[in-house]
Amino acid sequence: GGVRLQGFYWDSQKETNWKVLTNQADELSKYFDLIWVPNSGTPSSYYHNSTSTSMGYDPCFWLTHNSSFGTEDELRTMIATYKAKGTGIIEDVVINHKNGLSDWCDFPAENVKGRNTGKEYKLSWSLADICKNDECANKKDEKGNQKYPVTGAKDTGDNFDGFRDLDHTSA
């Protein structure tokens, strides 16, 4: 067993960013085994405007971790600081949330070299990765044709109209 602290609340980027939580590690690690933090993947809103205040649940990039809560370096420092004190960090990931860079379905390809391993990590996306019953399938272009001809399997979970429903059966 153990005790987990929710290290954020809605729109708490200033009060609970990575630097603030790192500075509180001496105190918090005395009482908590885990600190729960929001998704750290870079949202498209932050990519376009670094003053964006996204909570991170609209990630566009999964392999880049700069957000309104801080930079990837600040995140790594926070994790290392708590780990050294025996406290873990757990990230709140909504695996079915994926946002496009500038529209519904333009998911950028990602290519990142691991800092510790030197290994290349790559992600690429297509319309086949989006469930065929996602609401984007109902969007029409100016000629009345399906704007996003998505071809993934039917959604296996709850539908959420805010972001694309990803086909996890094709992984």
Model features per residue range: what roles?
Residues 3-26, 30-171:
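Substrate-binding/active-site clefts of carbohydrate-active enzymes
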